[in-house]
């Protein structure tokens, strides 16, 4: 038997940072894990003495490396969608900032108004929140960590998939991740691109395991992916304010999509990162 009881619910509009603990500590953790990933990417590939000699002799200008990084933020053939997604996420964040909603953190009430995923509203017909919340972030560090992860995976994955497949995976897995978050806890205000980014990482892992990428590249990529994914999932288990349901939903759906795409992508990847098969398709899009 179940006794009748009265339950009272009330909304909590606390700043997003209050659910994330020590912001300074999280800042250090984010950059530490990012540095570790890049270190692994450097150590595992074969060492090239010629490149080292060129650096030591001054033949390679150090400023060129900075210019190369900035160039990654410019839409171009083979890498068009990722910068656009970064601009969209950063643009919305800056708009909220200049309108006075905050910087390091935003209030949950304001995030709901801007389109965050909130069960009582989403399930009453505002299904568009499953998509719009993926372009909102709870604060600066939330945005910075996600954009770092997006650029890292986009550099390698977008040239292989092409524009339509890439943006399709991003949007679809982002919506699935939002639905997973809603299913797990429909009273939480959730937002962020991490579900969609985990979807891209899931697809990336699937293509690494199916040997779409050359063997000499796969080892470094795979270790980096597992460190990034594992770290975030563990932090979601031991910390507050991390939506592991969205992360897992995006990761699993992305992995399955990657497996489904494998037959059409097998043997199309070149070492310079340009996909010949998809290059011709992109020109028609």
Question: Over which residues does each language-model region extend?
Answer:
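A detector for small-residue-rich transmembrane helices and their helix-helix packing motifs
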Residues: 3-284
């Amino acid at each position: 038997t179940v006794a009748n009881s009265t339950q009272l619910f009330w909304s909590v509009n606390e700043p997003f940072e209050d659910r994330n603990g020590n912001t300074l500590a999280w800042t250090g953790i984010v950059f530490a894990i990012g540095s570790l990933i890049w270190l692994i990417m450097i150590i595992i590939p074969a060492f090239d003495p010629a490149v080292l000699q060129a650096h030591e002799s001054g033949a390679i200008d150090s400023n060129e490396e900075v210019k190369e990084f900035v160039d990654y933020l410019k839409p171009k053939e083979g890498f068009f969608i990722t910068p656009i997604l970064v601009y969209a996420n950063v643009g919305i964040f800056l708009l909220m900032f200049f309108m006075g909603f905050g910087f390091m953190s935003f209030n949950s009430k304001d995030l709901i108004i801007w389109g965050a995923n909130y069960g009582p509203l989403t399930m009453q017909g505002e299904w568009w929140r499953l998509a719009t919340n993926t372009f909102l972030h709870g604060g600066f560090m939330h945005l910075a960590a996600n954009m770092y992860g997006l650029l890292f995976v986009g550099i390698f994955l977008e040239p292989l998939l092409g524009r339509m497949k890439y943006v399709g995976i991003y949007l679809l897995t982002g919506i699935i991740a939002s639905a997973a978050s809603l299913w797990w806890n429909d009273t939480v205000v959730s937002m962020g691109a991490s579900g969609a980014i985990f979807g891209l990482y899931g697809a990336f892992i699937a293509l690494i395991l199916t040997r779409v990428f050359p063997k000499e590249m796969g080892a470094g990529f795979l270790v980096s992916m597992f460190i990034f994914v594992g770290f975030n999932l563990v932090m979601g288990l031991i910390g507050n304010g991390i939506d592991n349901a969205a992360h897992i939903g995006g990761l699993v759906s992305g992995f399955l999509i990657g497996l489904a795409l494998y037959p059409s992508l097998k043997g199309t990847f070149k070492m310079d990162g340009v996909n010949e098969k998809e290059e011709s398709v992109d020109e028609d899009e």
